[in-house]
């Protein structure tokens, strides 16, 4: 029993307050990245060939390529990847890109073309593999290594392709009239806008160019005026009836009309409805039922109608009237004169059906398809004379050519849904029907039927993840390549070439490199802590190529939308100009194949909530009524209340329980990972929750990580999915453990083709992108049995597999002498001395020795004019030792650079005479520690160019590395031997031998004792009589030999890589990288924060004895200002304080029971208390089943404080907190009497005290504060530069000048503006004066004045400073005279 628990005891056990069971598994948090890129690359080819997506689709869309004459064709067959040349760690160390070579099989077909008939016949086919550049691979953690740094490709949110209907909200025209518009957005290709103007004419725009009447576009599609009208309007037939006319009666047309003149039945002549009455829908229907067929109409009723068809004299072909002409007396007379007895008019009543298309046709000057095409051509290519062919080709290529225009499957699906079409989703171009449907829909909207689209709805925005972004980029590269290939195919003798000769893969490789190196979406990974990594990978940006820009994005795009629920976090977004444009994916959300974000829901069947989970996108969700996860359910899963709060079509409402058909899976599905880590999130104001989730990402990993007492249950998930903590790949038994690696002998998922050993290399003191320290520590001991997925090593900011960003500290909420004014934080010295908030940061320094014009630079210990004292940390090669403590200005790597010949001073001549050449012609360009940094050297790496001789240090590093590799190989070999020989012994034990090693009698039974007499390598010589078994033995032998060969080959390959020279930038001969670890204790000026957006700066560190203390002498660690709570409305921190206090109280109780156990050896009270704290639930293994060792292990783990989990929106309530405080024997007020550490007197009233989880943020005073001594000056103004990086000064600005003026400090002011800033001559004189010990100096003219004079001269004003002072002043007239 102890064996099975030895490991479980080392997982953190939490008391769960959540009441809602978790039905759905949370998807892997970096699935977004990995799934997308895997789908793009498809490294392994499936058995039926690859489907048409990702890289395959790109190749399929560009190939086959034909030359201009059609005499040859280059076809794409398939692609495959070679294994990557370097693994992830090697790429990190050598500044390389982690990638795999892409090999593409191409087929060149050459045709014979018959000159007479033009028939083609195949003349020659050649197939060849062509190298097409390297494809970056994704690491297991969803990142890319580009030039040695880890980068993340952020997913982009953009407007989904498809058709959108919108209006201008009445802003365009002064009358406030709504102008409707439709826009067809393809995935790539020209946009088509169709819009109304203020006069209700319909216009079309292509690619936001000049507008054309929409009918021009329809004519270009091959329609004429009559066809256009018949498409958009029904017709009504007026039939001549004596002097009057009759029209067919339809209830649909007449309902809701107010009758102007009597309605007369055309057949009987009776009045069916008198003038002035309104015809209701019911009355209209009744009239039809009574048998009203037609009604009388007068000529006045005809006036103002429009003809539905041309009136033509068929004998002569003369057109009297055209379709669409308005009927007036003259037109009617013409109609009657031609003897027409039936007139078809358009069914337009200007109320339900407007005459927009007819009016557009009337203003359109184009009459035919040719004119329309020419008009479009002139708009798209102004200045070029159109011909019918070129106009037709251009129009076709705009919307109907799959090379140029692609709606994408998403666009087609969206378009079908919006317009009720049924085209296949393989039809990726526009069709005539689509354009007609769009115009029809737009006219319907204008007539007041239908709804406009909401572009901020997540059904209309989709996510482009890595794979898709990469696909687009690679397509661009291939298209650039295509042009070059076509030209080469035409210019070269095609019969003699191979595919290789036609292809230059540079453009494709360059496109990939450019994307990873410089795209706005390829970002330097935020690696401050595991949470910031995971959040960065789950980020959704609306910016970037093809997206929005900060300046143009309005309020609507940034705002929270009802469809964000369960898809995008409403809380986590940056403060500042990017607010709302950069979002985070919600915890349970995933992206579907069309790029829409889906959220999971439980199905409700017949009023019972089931455990079936469905994922729905925003569009699919709109038709459902969805209950919240915290709705009360009975035993059978039915709703308790008659009416249930639910969401339907973006509104929150109370619905009868029968109508509810879905339910949320978890309360935390609406927030992101970072927000789900904040306990009592529901009690915090949204603005502070936003700061809280953003600041957790800036928490620096501390030297001793400690998981929070008050967690939310998300901590282990983040630690596991981020890859910070190492999870076992398969079950097994721990064979070896040390600080740098864990060796596990696998017992589960054994695969003959793979090794039976898993070696996990731990990262020790590696530098992250943000210079924080990545260090992993093993959690297992030799002999532990572990299962797949168990956490076997902790990483940065993790504690027993839980995310641990900060520390639990004892907080008192009270003012203390003004030291916590304005959110300042007062700390106890104990926190500094116990290294509670100490972190390690690793700085990287790099120096390169180049080949210069004057000769090569050299890395050496032999540096001119440097004392032996300054070289004490360098080895003979001139590189600092590992472990050396270095200070500002210390030499890390000695380097000398040849300098040009200049005339020599006598001293130099003397030196040259004594020491020979060396002394004069080199200068010291060593790499030194920058000012203000102290630390310890933890690692040195030396890189040499191929063929450059290695120095002693490089050889030593190489030897170490090879020893490490050999140890790995030997361990793996030993475990392999143990496994294989164990199996061999089992197989032949007790069998009769048919043969054996030398001196062995045939026919003897083989026993284990007998085997021990021979060396293991001779056991293979035993043969048994059983043929089947003998076959198995031989198979085992060959498998063993293969494994051995593979191991050796792998080892030799790695050694060869270590010994080989490195790829270097041009001109670099040798490069040294030095890593210095800096220990940063917390100090005044450092920024700290809790998880609820309660941030502050450390103002003072007090001696422990001055801190307020409790009756039992416990001192507070930290004092916060209580005024920081009410106005900020983040009450969550107070609840956390109380609950943390209860946790610590419980822990103390368990500590006392442990002492009792040590004295009496009675474990029962301890067991009972732990069973009371951790009741049986489905989250943890029941404590009742623990054996004594496990109970003790758990007790030791929780004696500082019991860990609890209070999930967001489903956490502990006030009653739970009170119950815990009571259990711990504490006051339910959560307040205690505190005593002043300085006087020992109690404070006037009780103070809230408890444990809060505090973080130290990555805004450290050491990185910010700096002081300038002598440094660089700006070239033009001659003023000191600004900023710490430039070693700059502080700007003495306009307002500071006013301050000194107000004090009347004239001399100080003059000094500030001259000698301390940009009076070039003056500052030199001051320096000399100070050196002499003299304190008189004179200010001159500041350089900025000269700049002003020059500026004025550039404007044509010649200004000169007249500084010739009168030598003698004229004598004043004497008063006596």
UniProtKB/Swiss-Prot annotation:
Keyword annotations for this protein?
DNA-directed RNA polymerase, Nucleotidyltransferase, Transcription, Transferase
Its EC number(s): 2.7.7.6
GO terms of biological process kind: DNA-templated transcription
Q: Do you know which Pfam families this protein is assigned to? A: RNA_pol_Rpb2_1, RNA_pol_Rpb2_2, RNA_pol_Rpb2_3, RNA_pol_Rpb2_45, RNA_pol_Rpb2_6, RNA_pol_Rpb2_7
Q: Which organism is it from?
A: Brucella canis (strain ATCC 23365 / NCTC 10854 / RM-666)
Q: Which GO terms describe its molecular function?
A: DNA binding; DNA-directed RNA polymerase activity; ribonucleoside binding
The Gene Ontology CC terms held by the record are: DNA-directed RNA polymerase complex
- What is the protein's given name? DNA-directed RNA polymerase subunit beta
Q: Which InterPro entries does the record cross-reference, listed alphabetically?
A: DNA-dir_RNA_pol_bsu_ext_1_sf (IPR042107), DNA-dir_RNA_pol_bsu_external_1 (IPR019462), DNA-dir_RNA_pol_su2 (IPR015712), DNA-dir_RNAP_su2_dom (IPR007120), DNA-dir_RNAP_su2_hyb_sf (IPR037033), RNA_pol_bsu_bac (IPR010243), RNA_pol_bsu_CS (IPR007121), RNA_pol_bsu_protrusion (IPR007644)
The answer on whether this UniProt entry bears the keyword Endoplasmic reticulum reads no
